[in-house]
């Protein structure tokens, strides 16, 4: 066959990336939308502070209908909310089919934080956009990470607390004429 999967083991070819609720992988927590299926979306994103700083510049990726993933480190929940608000008001979040939040780690609560937690940010975000918001995907500044094929076309399936991201990386073998 001229087209075949590249870089994925047999299990991943058949099942996609399965992230189970028993492991601290991409779960919806308390799902805003219990069952969702997103088809043919560009997977893109990265560090939230970097993306927020690029809004309004020619360097900000112009992805519509994508699956946006973001994470950060050493950022308090109110700062995460501020950066997501910037993406919201720039129209970025409304153009996505899904938003996947990574693990926001290594911030220290201060006395003035008054208990404002990341879950409050997640609840607020879910109230602001129509796209499903998934949480706790292990990527970025965490010890155990999943591989995310940035720029690949993916499908996303959410059933209750389980989320699956499917990706098919295809290549064409060079023809003898190309050699």
Range-by-range predicted roles:
Residues 48-52, 81-85, 119, 123:
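Predominant activation on well-ordered alpha-helical scaffold segments within soluble catalytic domains
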Residues 35-36, 43, 60-62, 92-93, ...:
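Solvent-exposed alpha-helices and their adjacent loops that cap or buttress functional pockets
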Residues 59-113:
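Internal helical hairpin/lid segments
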Residues 6, 10-49:
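Conserved anion/nucleotide-ligand pocket segment
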Residues 103-170:
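ATP/nucleoside-binding phosphotransfer catalytic cores, i.e., glycine-rich phosphate-binding loops
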Residues 42, 48-50, 54, 64-67:
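Active-site rim beta-loop-alpha module in soluble metabolic enzymes
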Residues 1-12, 171-179:
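Single conserved hydrophobic/aromatic residue that forms the stacking wall/gate
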């Amino acid at each position: 066959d001229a087209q075949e999967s590249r870089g994925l083991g047999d299990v991943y070819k058949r099942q996609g990336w399965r992230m189970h609720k028993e492991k601290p992988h991409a779960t919806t927590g308390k799902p805003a939308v219990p069952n969702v299926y997103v088809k043919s979306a560009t997977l893109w994103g990265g560090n939230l502070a970097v993306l927020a700083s690029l809004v309004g510049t020619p360097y900000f990726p112009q992805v519509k209908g994508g699956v946006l993933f973001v994470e950060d480190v050493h950022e308090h929940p109110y700062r995460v909310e501020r950066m997501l608000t910037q993406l919201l008001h720039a129209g970025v979040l409304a153009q996505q089919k899904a938003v996947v939040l990574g693990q926001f780690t290594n911030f220290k609560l201060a006395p003035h934080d008054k208990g404002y937690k990341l879950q409050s940010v997640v609840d607020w975000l879910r109230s602001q956009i129509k796209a499903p918001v998934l949480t706790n995907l292990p990527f970025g500044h965490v010890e155990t990470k999943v591989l995310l094929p940035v720029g690949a076309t993916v499908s996303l399936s959410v059933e209750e607390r389980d989320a699956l991201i499917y990706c098919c990386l295809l290549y064409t073998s060079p023809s003898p004429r190309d050699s």
